[in-house]
Swiss-Prot record:
Belongs to the universal ribosomal protein uL15 family. This is Large ribosomal subunit protein uL15. GO terms for molecular function: rRNA binding; structural constituent of ribosome. GO terms for biological process: translation. The gene is rplO.
Length: 147
């Protein structure tokens, strides 16, 4: 076997169907779009969700909730993620961004108790810490300061 004799497996490469290239191709003249009508035109077709004039499903459903303009969105960090830091490290929004654990700080960082904490003596200075996470950090010899 040599490079010039390599061939693709039979049936692995399908020839693209070129429409509008003669009637004997099976997709000539109208290019598989039928005769006249909205869908035969260039740029034609209906928008997603359109139901032919019947009120769309999303309009039949009742409205729910609202978006609070004063909402606070926290960057979430779990205990298992804090294991990437050395023992005795200080955990703050700046150190987490520098360690590439958090990309965008948003309204601050919140530490949650997902996973097991193996890093010891961490000093955590973030916006929010869940009660379970606080207990786990203090059990591992660390301290928590909520800003």
């Amino acid at each position: 076997m040599e490079l010039h004799s390599l061939k693709a497996a039979e049936g692995s490469r399908k020839v693209r169907n070129r429409v509008g290239r003669g009637t004997s191709s099976g997709n000539g003249k109208t290019s598989g779009r039928g005769q006249k009508g909205q869908k035969s035109r260039s740029g034609g077709g209906v928008r997603p969700g359109f139901e032919g004039g019947q009120t769309e499903l999303f309009r039949r459903m009742p409205k729910r909730g609202f978006l609070n303009v004063n909402r606070k969105e926290y960057a979430i960090v779990n205990l298992e993620t804090l294991n990437r830091l050395e023992d005795g490290a200080t955990v703050s929004a700046e150190t987490l961004v520098a360690a590439k654990i958090v990309k965008d700080v948003k309204s601050g960082v919140k530490v949650l108790a997902n996973g097991e904490l193996t890093a010891k003596n961490l000093t955590v200075k973030v916006a929010k810490v869940s009660a379970a996470a606080k207990a786990a950090i203090e059990a591992a010899g660390g301290s928590v300061e909520e800003a």
